[in-house]
Amino acid sequence: MSGRTDDKTMGWMDLLAFGRAEIKALHKTWMAFFLTFYVWFNMAPLVSTIIKDTGLTLDQLKVLAICNVALTVPTRVLIGMLCDRIGPRKTFCIVMWTMAFPCIWFAFATSYTEMLISRLILSAVGTGFVVGIAMTSLWFKPRDAGFSQGVEAGLGNWGSSLAAITLPFLALTVLDSWRWAIAISGMVMFAYGTYYWFAITDGPVGTKRPMARKAQAIEVSTWGDLVSAILWTIPIVGVLALLVRTVTNKAYITAETSYLFYALIVAGVLYQVMALIKVNVPILRKGVPDDDKYRFTQVGTLCMSYVVTFGAELAVISMLPFFFQKVFQLSPVMAGLFGSMFAVLNFFSRALGGYVSDRMTTRKSAHLIYLAGVAGGFVLMALIGPEWPLALAVAVVMICAMFVTGGCGTTFALVPFVKRRITGNVAGYAGAYGNAGAVVFTTAYTFLTDNQFFLMIGGTAALTFVFCFFFMKEPAGAFAKEYRLSSVDTEIMAGGH
């Protein structure tokens, strides 16, 4: 069990201390994350305008929406690896610079094929989340990991919400062009990437960080963990098969084309497995010092936790407005208002989850409390029916949303403590599983009633609680002034790797 070495932890008012280097770094980083999410979600608010201007059908736009998330899951892992190898500053700038081009390409595309390809490439911009987590972990002490990560992720996630609010206004009122509205968002992101390159460092000036030895795959500590890592890696690419199945069933692509995509998915899985073996066999043959070992099940607990928090959040956001409209006979506007509660609460409750994690006696106990709240919250939501008072239904949804989004905060409060030099890798795995969870939940929803859907998520959260209760370890030094470094970290920092 970890004990505190200093009770002076970061609080809400510290966010206004702009003279402190770490606070300035936090604000610069959440803004970078914010812009990547603004660009990632810059199509959805303009769907009706795009259809009217281009003559595309709603089904064609739905395929574009699937392309918009298709590569996010596997690229989050790849970008996490890159973070650990070259640092989050360079990685963030690479993401912002490179993703600006498919954004602008999509804006001025002259054919549907161009729109498909550009949107597919642009789905990788969703990796900005992983880079922000890695950068924040370098600037803040272990005792402040939860709150700082929660603030960065909470504010950054608002990029999608602000895109929904501002882009229609910009496209229809200010610019009179959906193409320029989307293109300018990419240009702004590119410009901010250039600013970010000069405005920040990987942690406080003068500090050194241990780098991962290889960028191709996550490092493990035992042969058993290598098998575990392979099993946990397969779904990250394999989940894309569900997206292919969806577009095939809706006749968006032919069966013959789907076979090609399935073959590419299998090839991607095999590549990831071979990369894990190639990176880790030499390390394991040489032997891993005891102070450098970690259990891969620790990564697994965070992956499953993010499935039932962020994955559930994305899945529920997609159906909640219609749920309110159907159950309580609300207008689309009112249903949308109540259905947006998950997104609106994101900053406050996610930061609150991290804040609670920083202040409890153990981070594991804080996390388990939130997981129990997620399970209980969705069970209560499954009981909502037309006989309920609307106010009570809204209260239940708000409570559930507080636990779900707060659970995102307690999950990433644990990420930096798995193994210091692979924080980006761990964030990539957890982030990828969050998106994969959303794909699985939304696919399952097509076979379930609303109540069954909520019960399924609640049951999955309950199983995750049990999994974490038995297999999650309280990290050493979770409230310390500095992160613990292993003998291998020290050797790498000295240039001996």
Where are these regions (language model features)?
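Extracytoplasmic gate region of multi-pass secondary transporters
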Residues: 43-45, 233-263, 297-340
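Central cavity-lining transmembrane alpha-helices of secondary-active solute carriers
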Residues: 63-80, 340-353
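Conserved MFS/SLC helix-loop-helix module at the cytosolic interface between two early adjacent transmembrane helices
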Residues: 74-113
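Cytoplasmic membrane-interface "Motif A"-like loop-to-helix N-cap segments
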Residues: 85-96, 358-372
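C-terminal ends and interior cores of transmembrane alpha-helices
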Residues: 97-110, 372-387
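Cytoplasmic helix-loop-helix junction between adjacent transmembrane helices
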Residues: 118-155
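Glycine-rich segments within core transmembrane alpha-helices of 12-TM secondary carriers
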Residues: 146-168, 428-441
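Helix-loop-helix hairpin linking two adjacent transmembrane segments in secondary transporters
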Residues: 152, 156-266
